[in-house]
């Protein structure tokens, strides 16, 4: 559970009441930035694991040791650290480390950015960042998205992260769609499991999943953050601050109302294309399935913005999104449960659920007090039917 913003004094007073329902339901940890918040949790919920947020800007073994000494069990180091620096901290301090492996990156130091607060009164340290780093800025004659960074993708280096002692992978997903969340978590779990099982073909596997994630969301490609190279212009997505898509062809002919596109990749009906030229962008929808090297005709619009030779990008891969929905999101894992229902007049109804199999888990749900039936009493078969409706 994330409570990793800076709180005001009057908000801290209400914090125990806010967290208590989640605590009673079994939340397994809380990530914090504010040391006052950490102190409140330690006093009111002493057995609740606390994790230090990347907003704390912990960048050394001394910071890690401090967090361990005040009772934190895990922390997310500054995103500006290299893998060697993270490995060094892990070798010296016995504390779990969680690092970012995928998603949007901040231009500023973790937890230190005041730009959104100054520019629009929305503090990033209060969870309200307006993302001014995704705006265009001018420097001399250059006018570009000078503070907009590419998204991070560490799929090809999952093994190196594990070998460095990193305990948990963190995926940035602010305001992202379910398909993004499902695909990224699935890809990293697959690579992690493959590496730990000794898979000999991780390169092809990582390339396949990276191509999938690039089709879902990327800003001018991906970068590896500060893990290896450090900062540099190669980290910037200065041409476009949002989803770039993937290049699938170019315009070869204009025959109103149609545009002919020579494909460099397979496309599918329902895909959304963007034709990009010097005059601007035009969004169109593909109505056919076609393979690379073929030419297709797509109904166009805003022809004053389109020229022969314009590059065409796919910003929505319809078949991929449908596959993710079907094979990952809707593919719920089923487990066998044992249910014990106790209902006695004058006593509170109790339902005990226990999982069957390798992962043992129990949960006790206490309901209202049982009373005599005013009309027809509930039968055992009816209760069993209701319980089975849960899945």
Where are the model-predicted features located?
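Short glycine-enriched loops at secondary-structure junctions
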Residues: 5, 33-37, 56-58
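Surface-exposed amphipathic alpha-helical tracts and adjacent flexible/coil segments at the periphery
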Residues: 1, 9-16, 20-23, 32-36, ...
């Amino acid at each position: 559970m994330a409570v990793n913003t800076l709180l005001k004094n009057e908000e801290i007073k209400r914090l125990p009441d806010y967290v208590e329902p989640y605590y009673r339901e079994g939340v397994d940890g809380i990530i914090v930035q504010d040391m006052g918040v950490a102190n409140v949790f330690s006093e009111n919920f002493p057995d609740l694991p606390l994790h230090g947020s990347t907003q704390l800007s912990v960048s050394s073994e001394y910071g890690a040791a401090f967090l361990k000494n005040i009772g934190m069990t895990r922390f997310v180091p500054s995103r500006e650290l290299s893998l060697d620096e993270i490995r060094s901290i892990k070798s010296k301090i016995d504390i779990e480390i969680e690092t970012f492996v995928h998603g949007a990156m901040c231009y500023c130091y973790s937890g230190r950015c005041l730009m959104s607060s100054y520019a629009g009164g929305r503090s990033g340290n209060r969870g309200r960042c307006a993302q001014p780093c995704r705006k265009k800025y001018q420097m001399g004659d250059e006018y570009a998205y000078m503070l907009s960074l590419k998204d991070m993708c560490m799929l090809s280096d999952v093994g190196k992260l594990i070998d460095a002692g990193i305990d948990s992978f963190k995926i940035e997903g602010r305001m992202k769609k379910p398909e993004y969340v499902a695909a990224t978590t699935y890809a990293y779990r697959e690579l992690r499991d493959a590496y730990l099982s000794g898979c000999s073909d991780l390169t092809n596997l990582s390339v396949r999943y990276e191509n999938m994630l690039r089709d879902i969301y990327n800003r001018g490609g991906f970068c590896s953050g500060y893990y290896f190279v450090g900062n540099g212009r190669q980290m910037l997505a200065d041409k476009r601050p949002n989803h770039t898509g993937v290049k699938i062809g170019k315009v070869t002919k204009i025959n109103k109302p149609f545009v002919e596109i020579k494909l460099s990749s397979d496309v599918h009906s329902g895909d959304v294309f963007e034709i990009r030229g010097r005059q601007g962008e035009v969004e169109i929808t593909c109505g056919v399935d076609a393979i690379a090297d073929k030419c297709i005709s797509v109904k166009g619009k805003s022809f004053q913005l389109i020229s022969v030779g314009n590059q065409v990008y796919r910003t929505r891969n319809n078949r991929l999104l449908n596959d993710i929905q079907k094979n990952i999101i809707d593919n719920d894992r089923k487990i066998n449960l044992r249910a014990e229902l106790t209902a006695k007049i004058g006593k509170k109804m109790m339902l005990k659920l226990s999982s069957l199999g390798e992962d043992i888990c129990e949960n006790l749900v206490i309901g209202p007090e049982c009373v005599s039936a005013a009309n027809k009493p509930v039968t055992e078969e009816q209760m069993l039917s209701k319980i089975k409706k849960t899945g």
